[in-house]
Structures are given as C-alpha cells and as structure tokens.
Amino acid sequence: MTTIFYAEPELVLGHGRKVLFLNPNDLQIFKDIELPADLTTCGLKIAAGETNEEQQQPVGSEKAAAAGTNLEVSIVNVSYSPDRQLIALTTAGQKALLLYKSRPEHAKLLSVRALARASSSLAFAPDSSSVLVTDKTGDCYRYDCVELEAPPQLLLGHLSIVYDILWTPDQKYIITCDRDDKIRVTNYPATYDIHSYCLGHKEFVSGLALLTGTEHLVSASGDKTLRVWNYLSGKQLLQHELPAPAVRLQLRQLLPAKRFQVAVLFYDHVEALGLYELALDEQSNDAWTIARQQLVRAEAGSWNISCFALTADSIYVAGALDERLTLRVYNSSDGEQAKTVPTGWLDMVTERFADQTCVPEDLSVWFKKRYDNVSDYMERKKRRIEDHQQQQQQQKS
C-alpha cells in the first residue's frame, strides 16, 4: 500500500518497507526510514497464545518465502504528530505500530507495539501525547506516546471498517467514518457516550477533514457527494454532487480565512481528481458554497492511481505502472503536468522503491453488495406459475 501527504515543508512518501521525507522545493531528501524484513529484530513481540507457525516464522527466512505467506512487512499508514516531534506508522503482514522520534537527519525508533488486527487509519492527538489506531473490524485503540509501555486502551467500536478518524483541536470529540455510510462524533474521554451522528451518505464515507476555525467538517463518499456538516449538531450544511465516487480526500486552508481547497480522488473515472474551493458565507456561519471547481485528468486510465498530496501549487500523485511505484506532479492551477519538477528527480525518488512491487488496492470491495430479494422472489414465483401451467396442459392432453 502507498501513502503520501504534505506536512510543510516535507513531502512524505511511504511504500513497502520504506518512508522518504522529501523537500519538493530544493529537491532534497531530508531523511528516510527503512523497516527490517522481520520486525521481531527491532523489538516486535509475538502476542501470547499465537498458534500460527507462519506468524512466528521470521519473514526473511527461506521457509516463509517458499511458503508464499502474506507476512511480508509493508507500511499501511504514516502520520506526523502536530508538534512534528514524532512519526507513527502501522504495518501489515507483521501487524505493528512503530513510533519514531523525528530528528533533522535520522528518525530514532522509540517503540514497536503489536496490533491485534490490520490497521485502517491513524491519527495523533492534538497535543501529540497519544495516537489513535483503527482496525478493519471497526475498533479504535489509543496508544500512549509518553508511557510507551502502557497497554493500548480500547476507546470505541464500529460494526464495519473505519476509513478515517479525526480528533478535534479541543480534544473533546473523536470523529470517525465507516463503510456503513456513517459519520460518528464520540465524546472524549467518555467514549461510551456518542455525541452526534452526521447521517445522509448512501455509500461508504472515505475521508474527513476539519474546517479550521469552525465547528464544521467536510466529508467525501462513494455515493458521489461532497458534504459539509456541523459535527456538534449533526446538521448537513452543504451537499455537492461529484462526477464519480470519491475514495480519497485532502484539504488545504486558503487565505483569507474560512476558505479551503478540497481535493478528492475519484474511483474509476476519466478524470482522476477534483479540486473544489469551499467558502463560508460572511453573512452566515452555516452557509458554505463551492466558489470554484476544477477536474484534473492526471492521465487516468494509463496507470493505477492510489493516493495524492496537495501543496500550494502542485498535486503529487502516486500510483502503480507495471507493478512499479510511479510519482507524477500536476499544477493545481490548470491540472497540467508540472514542468518545474525535473523528471530525473521523480525517477530518483521512485528508484528508491525499485525493490518493492506496487500492486494497487482493490477498491471495489469498499462498495456494499446489495441484494434485491423482491426481484428474486418474483422471478421464482413466475417460474412456479409457468411450471404449474405446463403441468395442467400435460394433464389435459
């Protein structure tokens, strides 16, 4: 799985077992993180009671390779703490949460903690004291970033996979979205108490972002809509129709205040990305409008786009081409491929991942399978009537 995001001035790109921290302005690599093939060599402890021999077998061994197990370590999520002092990442294969101390040249590993299940999203607390990890069964755990030996704390649970998680700046609410169309606002630390729901989406909610300076958030969904909510009341403030289902969302604040650029990645559409400028009506605290919108082709169809990062002038798009990681840059202004970024530099970056295959995620499984029981019943009833009529005709003859 590939992940990319922009935390000024760094562009962070993670894939396979590597994370690169890039400066897109001077085309330098700040630092990198490379995980070992077997995380037990850096402190991962196998959970007590684990009975699967393959889980205990070192990933780098010949036996594991020959068996073709799915225990190859690969990075799933990467996140910077708000104070920029910590880096957290989660892995698949050997499921773990790794916490690093961010330093100018090298990141120092602080802890490696086993995860019970594969992670789906990751978010730091606003004060950087802890990190939230959600898994594919819908559970959300809190891991302490100060007391590194403290056990994880189960905070809340969904009945389906959680795709994104936010922690409000005042740390009073944790906001989650899932495959079952829901956006849930949970009180913190009393997470047994649900404050509100933001309901209205008809398909999975793939991404959330807080609109700074307000009590509002924006969401993107597989139902082809972009929506703005008051998360305290659960009231919908804006609904904008998209040309295709949205599977990724990024947000960037603009000047003047309370103007934001929202970017979404579309699923299986001729245009890969959509850019939308959100503006709050000066006469009202609840009225949002789409002031500007633009579609970016990004050569959709010629390669498999998996994620992107949004900067002031550019869109960095990562994906797979012939099972190799590919990175391309487009202008935010016109959607054309950027000519200011040397192709050689992009090739140099992706060459660092040359030993890692890049297989795109199958996003079709995000959509819920719907069954029309009435149609099936009517079809069976029709066949019974036809069979009965045939039997009557045979008896008469």
From Swiss-Prot:
<dbReference type="GO" id="GO:0005634">
    <property type="term" value="C:nucleus"/>
</dbReference>
<dbReference type="InterPro" id="IPR001680">
    <property type="entry name" value="WD40_rpt"/>
</dbReference>
<dbReference type="GO" id="GO:0001673">
    <property type="term" value="C:male germ cell nucleus"/>
</dbReference>
<dbReference type="GO" id="GO:0106004">
    <property type="term" value="P:tRNA (guanine-N7)-methylation"/>
</dbReference>
<comment type="subunit">
    <text>Forms a heterodimer with the catalytic subunit Mettl1. Interacts with mei-P26 and weakly interacts with bgcn; required for the function or formation of the mei-P26-bgcn-bam-sxl complex. Interacts with nanos; may be involved in mei-P26-dependent derepression of the BMP signaling pathway. Interacts with Myc; the interaction may be mediated by mei-P26 and may be involved in the regulation of ribosome biogenesis.</text>
</comment>
<dbReference type="GO" id="GO:0001674">
    <property type="term" value="C:female germ cell nucleus"/>
</dbReference>
<keyword id="KW-0853">WD repeat</keyword>
<keyword id="KW-0217">Developmental protein</keyword>
<keyword id="KW-0539">Nucleus</keyword>
<dbReference type="InterPro" id="IPR028884">
    <property type="entry name" value="Trm82"/>
</dbReference>
<keyword id="KW-0677">Repeat</keyword>
<feature type="repeat" description="WD 5">
    <location>
        <begin position="300"/>
        <end position="340"/>
    </location>
</feature>
<keyword id="KW-0896">Oogenesis</keyword>
<keyword id="KW-0819">tRNA processing</keyword>
<dbReference type="GO" id="GO:0007283">
    <property type="term" value="P:spermatogenesis"/>
</dbReference>
<dbReference type="GO" id="GO:0043527">
    <property type="term" value="C:tRNA methyltransferase complex"/>
</dbReference>
<dbReference type="InterPro" id="IPR015943">
    <property type="entry name" value="WD40/YVTN_repeat-like_dom_sf"/>
</dbReference>
<dbReference type="Pfam" id="PF00400">
    <property type="entry name" value="WD40"/>
</dbReference>
<protein>
    <recommendedName>
        <fullName>tRNA (guanine-N(7)-)-methyltransferase non-catalytic subunit wuho</fullName>
    </recommendedName>
</protein>
<dbReference type="GO" id="GO:0048477">
    <property type="term" value="P:oogenesis"/>
</dbReference>
<keyword id="KW-0744">Spermatogenesis</keyword>
<dbReference type="GO" id="GO:0005829">
    <property type="term" value="C:cytosol"/>
</dbReference>
<comment type="similarity">
    <text>Belongs to the WD repeat TRM82 family.</text>
</comment>
<keyword id="KW-0963">Cytoplasm</keyword>
<feature type="repeat" description="WD 2">
    <location>
        <begin position="114"/>
        <end position="153"/>
    </location>
</feature>
<feature type="repeat" description="WD 3">
    <location>
        <begin position="157"/>
        <end position="196"/>
    </location>
</feature>
<keyword id="KW-0221">Differentiation</keyword>
<comment type="pathway">
    <text>tRNA modification; N(7)-methylguanine-tRNA biosynthesis.</text>
</comment>
<dbReference type="InterPro" id="IPR036322">
    <property type="entry name" value="WD40_repeat_dom_sf"/>
</dbReference>
<feature type="repeat" description="WD 1">
    <location>
        <begin position="70"/>
        <end position="110"/>
    </location>
</feature>
<comment type="function">
    <text>Required for the Mettl1-dependent formation of N(7)-methylguanine at position 46 (m7G46) in tRNA. In the Mettl1-wuho methyltransferase complex, it is required to stabilize and induce conformational changes of the catalytic subunit. Required for binding of nanos mRNA and repression of translation by the mei-P26-bgcn-bam-sxl complex. May cooperate with mei-P26 and nanos to derepress the BMP signaling pathway. May cooperate with mei-P26 to suppress expression of a subset of microRNAs. May cooperate with mei-P26 to regulate bam expression levels in germline cells during gametogenesis.</text>
</comment>
<feature type="repeat" description="WD 4">
    <location>
        <begin position="200"/>
        <end position="239"/>
    </location>
</feature>
